[in-house]
């Protein structure tokens, strides 16, 4: 996959929201479902987009929420946005999405990308996706982006 094209695809995720991420039900590819919005004055309708990271040989997910916020965010009443008690002062997990800020970036070639490229005979890339709750690092070969139909739900 051409790195300039890949970088452009990743740049288009800036400041949108991740609503789901995980391996597909067949366990080879990793999908990141994004809710993309624009200023209503543009006339661009919101859309759910599937970023399918193909041949994903490594996926790491780590929290971006600091420990001191975690400490005050353990209460289960923070799991539902509608009923979360603002007086608890913790992170409201129930928002059901994570803001992509600063977003996704293509990382420089690494030992891991070189090793997998050599082993499989295809190019590999590494991307870092930063949100306000989780940071993802994915090692993959190709990226496909598609708009999702209304009612799409990831397989479980």
Regions found by a protein language model. Give the residues of each.
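Surface-exposed, interaction-prone regions used to assemble/regulate multi-protein complexes
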Residues: 1-156
């Amino acid at each position: 996959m051409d790195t300039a094209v890949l970088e452009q695809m990743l740049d288009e995720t800036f400041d949108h929201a991740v609503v789901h991420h995980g391996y597909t039900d067949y366990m080879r590819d990793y999908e990141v479902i994004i809710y993309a919005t624009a200023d209503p004055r543009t006339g661009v309708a919101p859309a759910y987009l599937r970023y399918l990271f193909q041949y994903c040989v490594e996926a790491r997910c780590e929290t971006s929420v600091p420990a001191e916020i975690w400490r005050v965010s353990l209460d289960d009443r923070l799991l539902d946005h509608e009923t979360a008690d603002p007086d608890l002062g913790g992170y409201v997990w129930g928002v059901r999405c994570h803001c992509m800020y600063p977003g996704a970036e293509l990382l420089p070639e690494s030992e891991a990308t070189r090793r997998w490229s050599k082993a499989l005979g295809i190019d590999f890339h590494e991307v870092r996706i930063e949100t306000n709750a989780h940071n993802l690092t994915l090692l993959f070969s190709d990226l496909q982006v598609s708009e999702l139909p209304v009612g799409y739900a990831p397989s479980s």
